[in-house]
Amino acid sequence: LKYQQNKLIANERHEAWESVARKIAHEIKNPLTPIQLIIDNLKKKYSELFDEKNKESFLEKIKTINKQVKLIEKLVNEFSDFARMPKPIFKKNELNKIIKDSINLMKTNDKDIDINFVSEKVYFVNSDYEQLNRVFINLFKNSIESLNEKSEKMGNFQKKINVEIQFINDYINIAVNDNGKGFTNSNPKIFSKPYFTTKKEGSGLGLSIVEKILNDHNGFIEFISQKEGAKIKILLPKYGN
């Protein structure tokens, strides 16, 4: 009964956030095109009217405005993506393969990070391959960003991500540990709330999308503070359960 209540609450919460994201995307996207056109016209019309010194300053300011417009466009696309998330197409998938595929993709982007994967055996889940793949890519990406931020502050160290699968109490338990900077907020539950982010250029929707996908898969996610780094625990029902 408690599980059903939690799932109902999560569904209602995501429906509300999807509605908000849809409205935000619509309201912000409309004025972006005329803003971009005006910027382009200003650049064309006035850049040749300045002397060399002032022209450089003018173009630099135009470049800054353009960069901010592109950032807003990126955020709008993320809002739209969150609002239009497709329904999962379920079939029997090998969980180990989904995780390995995600790890291999991340390793091509950052070869300096040691990603270790341990599993007692091969597990299968009733899942949408693309969506679960997206979950692990999102989580690994966050871990890598945390490790790189710590490296910038502390200098070089052995950057590690450990992924382990176990079967506990009728659920497949996936633990993702890293030795990065850890959770800076004292309440880890807030990380999956939409629009909460610790990044300078982020919408805070990444982990909300992760939570939404896992909820659709009858799974759970937990963010655990620890002395060094961060731990994320995912529970998924085994195929056939």
Identify the role of each PLM range.
Residues 2-26, 194:
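Conserved HAMP-HisKA connector
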Residues 214-215:
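Detector for a conserved hydrophobic position within an alpha-helical segment of the HATPase_c
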Residues 85-88, 124-127, 198:
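Conserved micro-motifs of the catalytic ATP-binding
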Residues 102, 114-124:
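Conserved catalytic submotifs in the C-terminal HATPase_c
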